[in-house]
Swiss-Prot record:
Biotechnological exploitation: Artificial BMCs can be made in E.coli by expressing pduA-pduB/B'-pduT-pduU-pduN-pduJ-pduK (in this order). Enzymes can be targeted to the BMC, and appear to be encapsulated within it.
Keyword hit for Magnesium: no
Compartments in which it is found: Bacterial microcompartment
Note: Bacterial microcompartments (BMC) 100-200 nm in cross section are formed during aerobic growth on minimal 1,2-PD-B12 or anaerobic growth on 1,2-PD-tetrathionate medium, but not during aerobic growth on glucose, anerobic growth on glucose or pyruvate-tetrathionate. BMCs can constitute up to 10% of total cell protein.
One GO cellular component term noted in the UniProt record for this chain: propanediol degradation polyhedral organelle
PROSITE patterns (UniProt xref): BMV
Organism name: Salmonella typhimurium (strain LT2 / SGSC1412 / ATCC 700720)
Listed name of the protein: Bacterial microcompartment shell vertex protein PduN
Lineage: Bacteria, Pseudomonadati, Pseudomonadota, Gammaproteobacteria, Enterobacterales
Amino acid sequence: MHLARVTGAVVSTQKSPSLIGKKLLLVRRVSADGELPASPTSGDEVAVDSVGAGVGELVLLSGGSSARHVFSGPNEAIDLAVVGIVDTLSC
């Protein structure tokens, strides 16, 4: 799992049937202290939200087959999922 900050939302009218009705979020991975890096090593990514996260929140990401299993099964077109909202973080 990884920590990320929700930076926006994605609207897609044409998508795989397995994504219909699912909320898509734009997320950027953050450092261990929850801060966006000064010069990000990677750009924003799209993740499917499973917990009702909003813009600006610190979240937990799950990727690959684990992300698909958060939803209904292994045939979902999902590679990255928001699986938790972080309340506190101590380093």
